[in-house]
From Swiss-Prot:
GO biological process: regulation of translation
Protein name: Ribosome modulation factor
Gene that this polypeptide is encoded by: rmf
Organism: Serratia proteamaculans (strain 568)
Family: Belongs to the ribosome modulation factor family.
Pfam families found in the cross-reference section: RMF
Length: 56
């Protein structure tokens, strides 16, 4: 049985979080055209920046 792909918005959030943890700027966002995906990516990025501030 094939595994189902994860939801695209969930994946965008996850990728944004990973980019934030690595310290990439928010201009690093690959989602320039789709507003929903960009919003999710930025949400993950912001969450990561908060987590970095707490642990730093």
């Amino acid at each position: 049985m094939k595994r189902q792909k994860r939801d695209r918005l969930e994946r965008a959030h996850s990728k944004g979080y990973q980019a934030g943890i690595l310290g990439h700027p928010k201009d690093y966002c690959p989602y320039k055209t789709t507003v929903e995906s960009r919003s999710q990516w930025l949400g993950g990025w912001r969450e990561a920046m908060e987590d970095r501030a707490v642990t730093a």
